[in-house]
Amino acid sequence: MTDTVELAKGDIISVEVLRPAHGGEGIGHHDGRVIFVKGGIPGDVVDVEIAQLKKKWARGEVVKVTTASADRVDSRCPAAAAGAGCCDYAELNPTVELEIKSRVLRDQLERIGGIDELPEFELQDLEPTAGWRTRVRLGVDASGRAGFRKLKSNELVTEVACSQVVPELLEGLVGEGARRFTPGVEIIAAIDDAGQRHVVESRKAPRGRRTETVLKVLEGTGEVEQKVGDYTWKFPVSSFWQAHTKAPAAYSEFIAEALTGLELVDVDKRGPVAWDLYGGVGLFAPIITSKLQAAVHSVELSPGSAEAGEEALAGLPVTFHTGRVEGMASQLPSPNVVVLDPPRTGAGSDVLKSIAEAKPQLVIHIGCDPATFARDVADWKLNGYEMDQLAVFNAFPGTHHFETIGVFVRVS
């Protein structure tokens, strides 16, 4: 067994980055320890400054690239190059980005999910890979300048833009000659499907409150208009919507394909039923009703999002319920199909158990964090469901984030 050499915070060591890790880091080894390397790309040899130290592992940041990986490129994001926490994959060749992300997911599913045999991954790169973000949140410093937050810091990068964002969205908001805002507020800006830019000043919700406060509408109406297929949603700019301009259509198309040809068992003789959990404004409800001819019950915590869904989908057999998914499942009619899109923290054991007890034939589970998705996959297995399909969407190009959709079938 290799002896562990004494290290201290601030020490600089040489590490070869061997593989990617969840969270955008690279993994290497040094004298018996696993080293997590912020800014490391597989194939790099780097000097790493130790920031966190444990008995069996350490975490640090690249201070010098001594031998660059073949997949390392010049930074594609001015804001990230200036220290912003936006595009942590800005120096990774975009042609290998989705493959790196699929490796991270596979590792999480094997280690955390306990899945030995995985279905073949369906990999989808969403275009464009720059200028794809149609909504953004900016901090405002003490002098009123808006900018992008540095990683785990309140400091802002105010001089340059992030390459994720649609360029016209940031015009006059960030950089030289940009307007000034109220110090300490947050700027929310979006360009909607009608081509209208909306800019508001807001203040985050205080602890225990669900909604933030929009202090002032600076441009537009403050109510965005988003269109997918034949349906148009109108809701406050502060409400959730998919960041990538092509994501709503891409996810909807995958769900439509997963539901195509599904033979539903009508046990109660009252017609097919589907649940749309963490449903937001009901983005997926039209696809579900169209493919299954089912009554859809959507559960969403935000009253504003549910109201927007009711208005947009009036005439469809969709019922919106406002509340937490944890307390709502037992009150809904038994479903044939469940679609759920939980937050980054995942759905969790209690929610998945309550869904499984309702015995849906098919579950479509959307995840935006590979670790919590893998944890939920393990719970599906415990509750008698197995993964039938798996898709990975590079819906956040230039970052370590990605979207995963798993299709699960009941086997017991």
Swiss-Prot record:
Its EC number is 2.1.1.-. S-adenosyl-L-methionine binds at Q242, Y278, E300, D341. It holds the Pfam family TRAM. Keywords: Methyltransferase, S-adenosyl-L-methionine, Transferase. InterPro entries: MeTrfase_TrmA_AS (IPR030390), NA-bd_OB-fold (IPR012340), SAM-dependent_MTases_sf (IPR029063), TRAM_dom (IPR002792), U5_MeTrfase_fam (IPR010280). It comes from the Bacteria. GO terms for biological process: rRNA base methylation. The keyword NAD does not apply. One of its GO terms (molecular function) is rRNA (uridine-C5-)-methyltransferase activity. The keyword Signal does not apply. Residues 6-64 form the TRAM domain. It is an enzyme of class 2 (transferase). The active site is at C368 (nucleophile). Belongs to the class I-like SAM-binding methyltransferase superfamily. RNA M5U methyltransferase family. PANTHER family: RNA M5U METHYLTRANSFERASE, TRNA (URACIL(54)-C(5))-METHYLTRANSFERASE. This is Uncharacterized RNA methyltransferase Cgl1903/cg2084. The lineage of its organism: Bacteria, Bacillati, Actinomycetota, Actinomycetes, Mycobacteriales.
